[in-house]
Amino acid sequence: MLTKITFFERFEPGILSGAKTITLRDEAESHVFAGQILPVSTFEADRWFCDIEVIDIVPVLFSALTEQHAAQENMTLPELRRVIQEIYPGLEQLFQIRFCLVQ
């Protein structure tokens, strides 16, 4: 089970503003549960910047990603597809973790 979660620094403003409300992860990073509070750090420097609460987690296929997923990720669908392919090249099975910022 995850006890913390990391994001690339470029996603920090979207998380803190509430514009980014989901993250797409592979199975290794899918072991969370609704109601879980996770400290959030930057991937690059492991710098804590907030806590999030997991709302839910659902499986989603890369080929089934929509504009709604992209909006929840605070980017366009082409951007989302590119980013996912950079992080998880060739991976079809993803897990959507929906979260909210803990104030």
Swiss-Prot record:
<dbReference type="GO" id="GO:0106251">
    <property type="term" value="F:N4-acetylcytidine amidohydrolase activity"/>
</dbReference>
<feature type="active site" description="Proton acceptor">
    <location>
        <position position="20"/>
    </location>
</feature>
<feature type="domain" description="ASCH">
    <location>
        <begin position="6"/>
        <end position="92"/>
    </location>
</feature>
<keyword id="KW-0378">Hydrolase</keyword>
<feature type="active site" description="Nucleophile">
    <location>
        <position position="23"/>
    </location>
</feature>
<comment type="function">
    <text>Catalyzes the hydrolysis of N(4)-acetylcytidine (ac4C).</text>
</comment>
<dbReference type="InterPro" id="IPR007374">
    <property type="entry name" value="ASCH_domain"/>
</dbReference>
<feature type="active site" description="Proton donor">
    <location>
        <position position="73"/>
    </location>
</feature>
<dbReference type="GO" id="GO:0016813">
    <property type="term" value="F:hydrolase activity, acting on carbon-nitrogen (but not peptide) bonds, in linear amidines"/>
</dbReference>
<protein>
    <recommendedName>
        <fullName>N(4)-acetylcytidine amidohydrolase</fullName>
        <ecNumber>3.5.1.135</ecNumber>
    </recommendedName>
</protein>
<dbReference type="InterPro" id="IPR015947">
    <property type="entry name" value="PUA-like_sf"/>
</dbReference>
<comment type="similarity">
    <text>Belongs to the N(4)-acetylcytidine amidohydrolase family.</text>
</comment>
<dbReference type="GO" id="GO:0005829">
    <property type="term" value="C:cytosol"/>
</dbReference>
<dbReference type="InterPro" id="IPR008314">
    <property type="entry name" value="AC4CH"/>
</dbReference>
<dbReference type="Pfam" id="PF04266">
    <property type="entry name" value="ASCH"/>
</dbReference>
